[in-house]
Amino acid sequence: MAHKKGASSSRNGRDSAAQRLGVKRFGGQVVKAGEILVRQRGTHFHPGVNVGRGGDDTLFATSAGTVEFGARRGRRVVNILPVDA
């Protein structure tokens, strides 16, 4: 057994908080304008119809409607289908 703790053990012992990334509103859910749909790093999902992209690649609804996930040109996209008034 070592009688010293080791060279770096006193410099360890920290961890970063999780970033809470991922899909926040799933397909078929009704959303209002401005609601966050996906939090991501990079464009894992691309913005589609009625969806905007923030500076940190967050996707958000630009109008009220129903969330739809799909594909366009081999990319995963998120669309908002408008609510029939």
UniProtKB/Swiss-Prot annotation:
Gene Ontology terms: biological process: translation
Family per similarity comment: Belongs to the bacterial ribosomal protein bL27 family.
Keyword annotations from UniProtKB, A to Z: Ribonucleoprotein, Ribosomal protein
KW NAD (keyword) present: no
Lineage top rank: taxon: Bacteria
Protein name: Large ribosomal subunit protein bL27
Gene Ontology molecular-function annotations: structural constituent of ribosome
Gene Ontology cellular component list: cytosolic large ribosomal subunit
Annotated source species: Mycobacteroides abscessus (strain ATCC 19977 / DSM 44196 / CCUG 20993 / CIP 104536 / JCM 13569 / NCTC 13031 / TMC 1543 / L948) (Mycobacterium abscessus)
Entry-linked PANTHER family: LARGE RIBOSOMAL SUBUNIT PROTEIN BL27M, RIBOSOMAL PROTEIN L27
